[in-house]
Amino acid sequence: MDVSYMAVTFCTFVIDMRVLIVNTAERTGGAAIAANRLLHALNRNGVEARMLVRDRKTEASQVLNIPQSWRLKANFLWERGVIWMNNGLSKRNLFQVDIANAGTDITRMDEFKWADVIHLHWVNQGFLSLDNLDRILASGKPVVVTLHDQWYFTGICHYSGECEKYKSQCERCPMLKGRGSDLAKRVFDRKLAMYEGRNLTFVGCSRWMADLARQSRLTQGHTVTNIPNAIDTDVFKPMDKQEARTKHGLPADKKLLLFGAQRITDKRKGFDFLVEACEHISMHHPSLPEILGVVVLGGDAESVKEALPLPVYTVNYLSNEAEIAELYNAVDLFVTPSLQDNLPNTIVEAMACGTPCVGFNVGGIPEMISHKQDGYVADYCDSIDFAQGISWCLKDDRHETLSTAARAAALATYAKPAVAHRYLEVYQAALSHQ
């Protein structure tokens, strides 16, 4: 795929289109990072785009935040409180669900009135309520929704796991154990009513997410497609490994794995399976433990340091993309034993840096890693196969080939011009139905 040709073609037919990207945060979390990258991709490729957030972190002129007041914190606390009361006063799954019972009306804002297309991303935890979403849909403006998780097409959960109630009717949510009002049913029914007859397009970041969305009763009658998240391949690119290691204080003489997550202790991130895989390597691959180390990236990295049977090098959470790219280049392999994921930005970033990846066969991960071509896709929840994947990828005679293939795959699929072009087509289709 000639990405440069796509970018030129893209810019020649864009005429006066204004897009408002809406996300809870500007920089924190995978959805925020993806939304921010799309903002820059659109603006660099012929579309006038702005981003509206609740939690602003920079002074970027294209990023705007809603008026700040005590109500924002109150909205968040009120929503958590209602969930807590309907969950038998338990904190279990407190942040795995959202009921969108409080938020901010953005339809009155000048930024909303300015836009031709409203592009919603992750808007939970007290940013937009169901009432707010209803007003957005009722405005008559085309609405595009990027599915960073399942919330838009389930009742209240972000990931349904083995539950398939969202296909027909969410009720008696297995994530809540309280006997109060059926929150899942109430929210599902409300979404069903407000989606009906509206100019609404759903975009999954992965084919897996789009396929799940198509099975939901909530998306029937609406377009569902998939477009991957964009990445800046001029930032995330191959660099000198030893220079990167020196800068981050990492040993020059070891093969290094990288594991990272915003919350390493989040069970969905699968850290326990990485521990098991490393234990298997220590027992069954005697030559590796002497030369192998694990870099753990995340705010709570120190808390898991003792769990791994290999030397561990901790790095605090990095928000600067250039430093993150350096860290990917400093290691030999990125490992992501995630148990449930959509289209992890981390895999795309690592591949763009020429760093092969090992992950489980789950969610959108097998769409990203081509098994034994640019990385290794291990059997789901199989720590032994995960260990085999690590060993296989680290073989000196194949690592360079995997690295080159990973970079090529990232350029072909996730470069900003290619992703921006595909979103432009979605926007134009939505506008044609206005």
Roles of regions detected by a PLM:
Residues 154-159, 178-224, 231-235, 241:
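A short, active-site helix/loop in glycosyltransferases that binds the activated sugar's phosphate group
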Residues 398-413, 419-425:
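A short, well-ordered alpha-helix in the C-terminal region of glycosyltransferases
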Residues 356-359:
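Short hydrophobic beta-strand element within catalytic cores of glycosyltransferases
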Residues 285-291, 296-325:
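Nucleotide-activated donor-binding/catalytic signature segment of Leloir-type glycosyltransferases, i.e.
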Residues 251-269, 275-279:
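Conserved donor-binding/catalytic core segment of Leloir-type glycosyltransferases
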Residues 371-372, 376-383, 392-397:
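Conserved acidic donor-binding segment of nucleotide-sugar-dependent glycosyltransferases
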Residues 326-331:
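Short alpha-helical donor nucleotide-sugar binding micro-motif in glycosyltransferases
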Residues 339:
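Aromatic "clamp/platform" in nucleotide-sugar-dependent glycosyltransferases that forms part
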